[in-house]
Amino acid sequence: MERPVPSRLVPLPLLLLSSLSLLAARANADISMEACCTDGNQMANQHRDCSLPYTSESKECRMVQEQCCHNQLEELHCATGINLASEPEGCASLHSYNSSLETIFIKRCCHCCMLGKASLARDQTCEPIVMISYQCGLVFRACCVKARENSDFVQGNGADLQDPAKIPDEEDQEDPYLNDRCRGGGPCKQQCRDTGDEVICSCFVGYQLQSDGVSCEDINECITGSHNCRLGESCINTVGSFRCQRDSSCGTGYELTEDNNCKDIDECETGIHNCPPDFICQNTLGSFRCRPKLQCKSGFIQDALGNCIDINECLSISAPCPVGQTCINTEGSYTCQKNVPNCGRGYHLNEEGTRCVDVDECSPPAEPCGKGHHCLNSPGSFRCECKAGFYFDGISRTCVDINECQRYPGRLCGHKCENTPGSFHCSCSAGFRLSVDGRSCEDVNECLNSPCSQECANVYGSYQCYCRRGYQLSDVDGVTCEDIDECALPTGGHICSYRCINIPGSFQCSCPSSGYRLAPNGRNCQDIDECVTGIHNCSINETCFNIQGSFRCLSFECPENYRRSADTFRQEKTDTVRCIKSCRPNDEACVRDPVHTVSHTVISLPTFREFTRPEEIIFLRAVTPLYPANQADIIFDITEGNLRDSFDIIKRYEDGMTVGVVRQVRPIVGPFYAVLKLEMNYVLGGVVSHRNVVNVHIFVSEYWF
């Protein structure tokens, strides 16, 4: 059998196999909803929690499990509320429940049951008032009737109470709650659930069911180890629960809080201190202090013991005495005494007359050392020295300037040294500036002044301009950046697949106005498949075939005595139509005709910009299992449409198959359209046994992409 393979075709058997696999998977996923509901009921009965993860792989089954679990959980909570209504404490014991949702359902049914019993106690009818809900009305009526029967269900029906978990069925009644063997609490001490087959008793949190299946006993969490007391705390069991108590006391001055922590006792606020009336209570951590209320005279202050002690004003007050006087502390006060200093040579009294200060002999306008010297003051005296940058000449007896630049060459300044009277001055070369130390030179960052039109790079003693991508530095000034015309470069013709447009610093590629769009890389043009996107205008009797940059609406009809093959049904928009010979009965001419199949296929080719070797464009594969290799031969031929011998066909053998390869051997400049007629002749003994005809519709685009 042979078939042209022009493009990516999915084999039909694979498609059928995938469909059968999907149908098989769907059949296996059919799960009983009743089994899903049973799983939800079991989760409610066993765990009393519907938030646990559901294990079914079916989404619908998980939804049924969740709904049945919540419905069963509400019935269990309602039965618990009815049972509580029969307890001595009634609905008041609901504070022991932890779940707020559970408490809501239990409380609702407990109250509705209490209303039914109260209605009977007031000699009223057991029909509920219309304002309450339907479910509350059922509980109201059941508890009212139960109270009227005076517990006949538990004691008067002769049922065996040795196994309270299973109770015989009662007569069906119209009211579902009258038919419920758990109404009024049933045989259970705490929680009751009627499954239809049996009555199951259960207990509240903190209790466990006894061996009789009816009674509940407290769980000692302290013995079972199910408590959560911390290290340093002791577990104390309570009815239905437990509490944690510290092992050691908090100590004097502290009390134990409800959360088992130690808190300081404010003895002053609680009034449990023992301070005398003349003292004030001051609270401290773990204790308190008593401070006296005694008032001391002026000049005295209370100490920690409440005694009055003298205040040393000379130490506690800033400058208690006027300038020139000394402070002397006394009992309860202080006195000021005038100072009389005696200054020696080189000292004199300050302006306030309080102390002796040094006489500055070097202070202008006095020049005791003469010109060129430096006067140095000292306590009580002075001395003469040469100024910095000068040295004393013993011959001339004068101070002479030191040329530091000559004496210390290359060691004083980083770049240039210039001598000055008594000192020196450092300077720097171009591109540098003097550092804060006045000697070193540091590089000047010329880029801070933006000398370049785009980017600036500072270098040691200078700077360098450079440009961003798409620009180049001007050869004229070395500062300005000029745009690079990428489209005009020698390689510009290969930058874009269609058209290059230069823009400042870059370029843009464009595609033909129709049939193409720009690829994500911004350079290549991609063909738009109008047949896939649905933007073609083919009629219902035509088939859309995508070609490079456009599309064609074609209609292929099979010749007389031929029918379209089922495997060419164009559901997947394939590019091949195959017609198989189908002769009418007794049509000998049709039977003798060697042509067995007539096929039409469509391919689209670009205009090759560079054509250096033949391009293989289509493959015809044939299998000849009925003919031995030494007797049968397959001859491929191009019979029509080969304009200027632009195409040829060669034969090769691959994987036990004979392959006819159609090649383009000459360049064709589009737009161009031709129909290439190919023949596959099966030759046996020099005679063509049968022939297959393939019509290849070739569309050559005007573009190379």
Curated annotation (Swiss-Prot):
Q: Please report the stretch or stretches of sequence annotated as the Anaphylatoxin-like domain.
A: 36-76, 77-111, 112-144
Q: In which tissues is it expressed?
A: Detected in most organs (brain, heart, lung, spleen, liver and kidney). Neurons are the predominant source of production in the brain. Not expressed significantly by astrocytes or microglia.
Q: Which UniProt keywords apply?
A: Calcium, Disulfide bond, EGF-like domain, Extracellular matrix, Glycoprotein, Repeat, Secreted, Signal
**Disulfide bond sites:** C36-C61, C37-C68, C50-C69, C78-C109, C91-C110, C112-C136, C113-C143, C126-C144, C182-C192, C188-C201, C203-C216, C222-C235, C229-C244, C250-C262, C268-C281, C275-C290, C296-C308, C314-C327, C321-C336, C343-C356, C362-C375, C369-C384, C386-C399, C405-C417, C413-C426, C428-C441, C447-C456, C452-C465, C467-C481, C487-C500, C496-C509, C511-C525, C531-C544, C538-C553, C558-C579
Region of interest (Self-association and FN1-binding), ranges: 358-442
Disordered: annotated span: 156-175
- Top-level taxon in the UniProt lineage: Eukaryota
A Gene Ontology cellular component where this protein is annotated is: collagen-containing extracellular matrix
SMART domains, from UniProt? Answer: ANATO, EGF, EGF_CA
This chain is glycosylated at N98, N537, N541
- Domain EGF-like, by residue range, is 178-217, 218-263, 264-309, 310-357, 358-400, 401-442, 443-482, 483-526, 527-580
Q: Give the main localization category.
A: secreted
Secretion signal: which residues? 1-29
Q: What induces it?
A: Glucocorticoids suppressed mRNA expression and protein synthesis.
Q: Which GO terms describe its molecular function?
A: calcium ion binding; extracellular matrix structural constituent; fibrinogen binding; fibronectin binding; identical protein binding; integrin binding; peptidase activator activity
BP GO annotations: blood coagulation, fibrin clot formation; embryo implantation; extracellular matrix organization; negative regulation of cell motility; negative regulation of ERK1 and ERK2 cascade; negative regulation of stem cell proliferation; negative regulation of substrate adhesion-dependent cell spreading
Q: Where in the cell is it found?
A: Secreted, Extracellular space, Extracellular matrix
Q: Which SUPFAM superfamilies match?
A: EGF/Laminin (SSF57196), Growth factor receptor domain (SSF57184)
**Stated family:** Belongs to the fibulin family.
SUBUNIT field: Homomultimerizes and interacts with various extracellular matrix components such as FN1, LAMA1, LMA2, NID, ACAN, CSPG2 and type IV collagen. Binding analysis demonstrated for isoform C a 100-fold stronger binding to the basement membrane protein NID than for isoform D. Interacts with FBLN7. Interacts with CCN3.
Task: State what this protein does.
Answer: Incorporated into fibronectin-containing matrix fibers. May play a role in cell adhesion and migration along protein fibers within the extracellular matrix (ECM). Could be important for certain developmental processes and contribute to the supramolecular organization of ECM architecture, in particular to those of basement membranes.
Protein name, per record: Fibulin-1
Q: Which organism is it from?
A: Mus musculus
What gene name does this entry carry? Fbln1
